[in-house]
Amino acid sequence: MAKMEDIVSLCKRRGFIYPGSDVYGGMAGTWDFGPMGVALKRKIMDAWWNYWVESREDIYGVDAAIIMNPRTWVASGHTATFSDPLVECGECHGRFRADKIADGITESVTTEEFKALNVKCPTCGKTNWGDIRQFNMMFSTHVGPVNDDSSIAYLRPETAQGIFTNYKNVVDSIYPDLPFGLAQQGKAFRNEISPRDFILRDRECSQMEIEYFVAPATWEENFEKLLEQNHKFLTEVMGLKSENIHDIEVGEKDRAHYSKRTVDIMFDYPNGQEELMGLAYRTDFDLMNIQRESGKNMEYIVKGSTERFIPHVIEPSIGVERLILAVLANAYRQEENRIVLALPEELAPYRFCVSPLLKNKPELVAKAREVYEILRNKYKNVTWDDSGNIGKRYLKQDEIGTPKCVVIDFDTLEDGTVTVRDRDTTEQIRVKPEEI
């Protein structure tokens, strides 16, 4: 597998991902997507939406506000429990997330347990640590013209609560049959103590989450179905190799406060095995808390009967940036004379690149433009490249991940055929433009 620094270099060189605010020296934990990165990100998010929402009858979309009534985060438990263990070095005063700088410990590690490990500071190498304290990761802001305690609000740390707060609206307006899901894509913000590993752990990210509402007695069968369907999405739609995907059953001590069962779907990233996505059985935790905090009835009445209950919830949740990094790592290939980003055709920023063999020959350029317009009208995501020689163009498109390069040469002027060169095999064939 590729090294992380190789992927980072490719992403900046070819316009996928840049450091956030790069012109001002950057800002830790923030990243900007360039032209190729935006195209890849959009295709990944669209593929997820098509797989989970547009291709199914039981999942519906919502798009909730980023800034919500702060009571939302009281009911969800985030104001009390959304925290990570922070430890500060007594020598250099560097601050770190305790469970990420030592092996074999969890988020619940105590000061005594941590100090007994004699962990060296990643910055100065000393072992003079202060006490561990819990650091709440929500970004706070103020709503309105007065900055006081009454105006405090938060940037959402997850998209899930926007789904839960709209559960009653959806049931009252379209009354879907159980089981049903509500899906959302959008930004989430987490004030990470130690953002690291490129886009794997950052302070601003995009999430894709589903809250799947089920009758309490059916949660186990629905959990297994969703687990299988998520694996299918990752391997068949995203093209990830199954041998790099692993299910980890999360123990009770390490589960989120709302979960009775969690499976972390792990991926073999360049820096090691990390969480790609999670599947959590949230029981009725969220709807019960909303009912208590809001005073609104969250019960679901089964159609055609008097049976009523608060549904239980199963949540598939995936970070878009984590998925993008998995797709990039899966596709990156270093060969003797070139680097190839072997993206699935449906995810590649461009499907075709059209070029004249020589850009100083007007007749070739004119014919190439004609072919370009034909393919662009047919496929949309087609690019034009006449920079440098043809060999350099091939290498550039290989790194971008373009599956096919179409070249117009002097034979095209004679017989109307063009050269189509395959990214993965480098094989070339001649066909008529209308046959592409």
What name fits each language-model region?
Residues 1-436:
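NTP/phosphate- and nucleic-acid-binding module
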